[in-house]
Amino acid sequence: MSGHGPAQPMTARRSGPLKGRAEIPGDKSISHRALILGAMAVGETRITGLLEGQDVLDTAKAMRAFGAEVIQHGPGAWSVHGVGVGGFTEPAEVIDCGNSGTGVRLVMGAMATSPLTATFTGDASLRKRPMGRVTDPLALFGTRAYGRKGGRLPMTLVGAADPVPVRYTVPVPSAQVKSAVLLAGLNAPGQTVVIEREATRDHSERMLRGFGAELSVETGPEGQVITLTGQPELRPQTVAVPRDPSSAAFPVCAALIVEGSEILVPGVSRNPTRDGLYVTLLEMGADIAFENEREEGGEPVADLRVRASALKGVEVPPERAPSMIDEYPILSVVAAFAEGLTIMRGVKELRVKESDRIDAMARGLEACGVRIEEDEDTLIVHGMGRVPGGATCATHLDHRIAMSFLVLGMAAEAPVTVDDGSPIATSFPAFIDLMAGLGADLAAG
């Protein structure tokens, strides 16, 4: 079983101006998908810039367990010798996906239409997260799932021996659910159709096309209609993974709120389905310039030049939530340093992430002297242009909560401690060194 070592408290103190280049790790969403699609292609896929956080390493291990040869050649440089669509072999061991909701749900989708059985588990946080939202649509293909009460891990999936194509409307915007259904559809005959009422991040669609799948996206009265033709032969690719906009959010937001800062963040994905935070920050008055805009691996990228800014509160519309679902914790920190109310609506999905992120941010911000209002679906931050700080904040084993409160401490009047900084390694292992290199005052304990 996945475990968790001793807690590693960390403290951030008010920092001088942040200066320099922030080299962000590769995008987590694209890294997971590159490994999985590489394993389902016939031949060798080469990947550069792969994120080597624990979540992605767990997906690499899972692909090995299903029979693909996954080799690391150097930092970020990997190759995957795929076994083809329908070529997975039954794993001999339990598949441990650690902390990764994305990893477990995508891998479940990838194996769901093969005639084999696999058992999945994860760490204490992942074992609390509901899997029914993925196993319900997979059941339509003929997959059977046996999990703990409430559809939780550990869970055994019995893949469909004779899968049927599926037409599925995603009930709650979720790129993970959409992607799991599309990956399952690869080994089903005929056409699998996924309907989204609200668009979510589209890395799976872009990458499936890149690997040679026949996939179309049309807008109809029901929403976005994605049609995938099953049982293609996927062709191996060379994948250059752009830098992760969700990880870039932390140094970007730190530079906005730490007085006198100016940083450059090169090569960040500007995928429009992931751009909600940057749209919101610009509305708040952030000084962010997008330089050297270009395309890499089918994804738009740019270098971000960020300067400290006087910010004002804004209302974030609910329809923006899918394009920034992982960024609300750090946005709520920025909102605390803005002048006026920031109202974030349509955020109930945050309650079933690695932690209940609305509750975790609300309690931590209140402890730091910020006035908060919340209900099931809304978070309101009363920005005062300054934050007293001086608190210890609970991270609930959630990497984004940990990084958000450390950024808060860099600009607060008194130091801010997080009870455990170790989960940061799941998505951004170099976060502490990177921020310290820019001038942040961070220390263990």
From Swiss-Prot:
Residues 1-25 are annotated as: Disordered. Pathway: Metabolic intermediate biosynthesis; chorismate biosynthesis; chorismate from D-erythrose 4-phosphate and phosphoenolpyruvate: step 6/7. Phosphoenolpyruvate binds at residues 28, 101, 129, 176, 357, 400. It is an enzyme of class 2 (transferase). Its main location: cytoplasm. GO terms for cellular component: cytoplasm. It is found in: Cytoplasm. Its EC number is 2.5.1.19. The active site is at 326 (proton acceptor). It catalyses: 3-phosphoshikimate + phosphoenolpyruvate = 5-O-(1-carboxyvinyl)-3-phosphoshikimate + phosphate. 3-phosphoshikimate binds at residues 28-29, 33, 174, 176, 326, 353. GO terms for biological process: amino acid biosynthetic process; aromatic amino acid family biosynthetic process; chorismate biosynthetic process. Keywords: Amino-acid biosynthesis, Aromatic amino acid biosynthesis, Cytoplasm, Transferase. GO terms for molecular function: 3-phosphoshikimate 1-carboxyvinyltransferase activity. CDD domains: EPSP_synthase (cd01556). InterPro entries: Enolpyruvate_Tfrase_dom (IPR001986), Enolpyruvate_Tfrase_sf (IPR036968), EPSP_synthase (IPR006264), EPSP_synthase_CS (IPR023193), RNA3'P_cycl/enolpyr_Trfase_a/b (IPR013792). NCBIfam families: aroA. Monomer. Catalyzes the transfer of the enolpyruvyl moiety of phosphoenolpyruvate (PEP) to the 5-hydroxyl of shikimate-3-phosphate (S3P) to produce enolpyruvyl shikimate-3-phosphate and inorganic phosphate. This is 3-phosphoshikimate 1-carboxyvinyltransferase.
